[in-house]
Amino acid sequence: LPSVKDVYVTMLPGGDYKETADKSGDLVKKGFNPVPHFPARSINSESELKEYVLRCKDLGVKQVLVIGGSREPIGKFDSSYQILETGYFDGIKIGIAGHPEGSPDISDSDLEKAMIDKKPYADYIVTQWLLDPQPIIDFISKQSVPVHVGITGPLKISSLIKFANIVGAKNSINFLKSNFTKALDLLKPKDPNDLIGKVKSHTDYFHIYTFGGLKETNKWLKENNYV
């Protein structure tokens, strides 16, 4: 892992919360600050949620990221707000998800309402990753808590377009297609330095989505003296 403090531990749809908690505990022992995901729609029941939170606390976890997660709920929880209002996260630093470019799974109006509902519980917001700086700047200006801007590690343009389509980052898709149209451009790796330069006066925090490219991201972080 790169020489960073915070390491987010994902819980994919169908994943085992015990495994996510235990991996987080291992990271605590190695000196990291693990931030396990709590995807509401992937949690079976309130008792499972309580057990997941308590297990994380017992293992030394101090911070979590609460998200909606998969499209279809497997239990009683349909939104991140529903697990936030249980009160089980008291005493833990809470991050919530932000979507400056919208989401393919929810309308813009419902997304705005969800943010209003969640924000009283949030210590900070982690955004989806994106490439167009203006939606990020506009989003940050409306928030009352710190915003951790989602960026990618170095990736080929073709890969960025693929992942942008998956998360529904509309502005970023248009940004990529308008700036990188040649076939050779699509094969070149792109790092987020330009984006960081344009938004760093608006935030002190960045959240890196490596998409499996830990080595490349670690190299980029060191070459740019970010760690």
Feature map (PLM): residue ranges:
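Catalytic grooves of carbohydrate-active enzymes
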Residues: 194-207
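Active-site glycine- and acidic-residue-rich loops that bind
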Residues: 43-46, 72-78, 126-140, 211
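Membrane translocator/pore-forming domains, dominated by Gram-negative outer-membrane beta-barrels
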Residues: 114-116, 120-122, 126-137, 146
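Catalytic cores of alpha/beta
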Residues: 46-55, 108-115, 119, 136-141, ...
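Active-site pocket-lining/capping segments in soluble small-molecule metabolic enzymes
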Residues: 76-102, 144-195, 212-214, 222-226
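Active-site beta->alpha loop and helix N-cap motifs at the rims of alpha/beta catalytic domains
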Residues: 1-112, 116-117, 122-123, 181, ...
